[in-house]
Amino acid sequence: LEKSDTLLVIKDVHTYYEDSYVLQGVNLEVPQGKIVAILGRNGMGKTTLIRSVFGLTPPRSGLVEFKGNSLTGLTPFRIAQMGLALVPQGRRIFKNLSVLENLQLPTSGLAKSKVHRRTEQNIDSEWTTEKVLDEFPQLRDRLTNGGNELSGGEQQMLAIGRALVANPDLVLMDEPSEGLSPRFVLHVGEIMKRMRSLGHAILLVEQNLALALSVADHVHIIASGRFVFSGTPEELKSNPDVLDEHLGVSSAKALDA
């Protein structure tokens, strides 16, 4: 990879969560405009990896770089200003705010400089509240509704939309398909492909194997804090033993669907 094409570099990262040694020497790169998926059973370190990048659970040692700048010691707020956005597990929208208020939050001060910088580069790829509502028409019908009045699928749309209006270079997505109907899962997959086509990179943590393999350019499987497989979706599909051992037989069967 050309260095200029690599947005995120994770080098020999070791992260502890309370007293647990969770990430045990993880190495990862996310190129610009690519989707990199992290798969693995529960408790293997997927969410901790996302938290380590976003400054929520800083690594004990190792390097996390974004666009050539170290993220060590930076707050999540500062990291967001640099062009990262997080769609957290469980959605975490502001349920006491309306849909419109949720969408306006990222541009109300969080990353105005970031938004303006990207606008100058390419105004056509700029995500606005209007463009997000075009992408998620269900939200347009619920603009004045509180976040607590939305279905799970609508809350996930809002969480993704809220990330997009900050116009990030890289979006960290933690289990975006969790609790969604199959129809919404397909929609989330289409949205991720569209984000990639507009130049966004995505680091995706996902339990839904079929979704991850349908969108990812590169896949890593994590087990006990280390990557036990790294390759393309096609390479993973041709390794049923890896699928069985690290993701379970049902996951391998799901690929036949």
Question: What positions do the PLM features span?
Answer:
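The feature captures the beta-strand-to-loop junction immediately N-terminal to the Walker
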Residues: 39-41
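Conserved ABC ATPase signature
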Residues: 146-150, 154
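Catalytic Walker B motif of ABC-type/P-loop ATPase nucleotide-binding domains
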Residues: 171-175
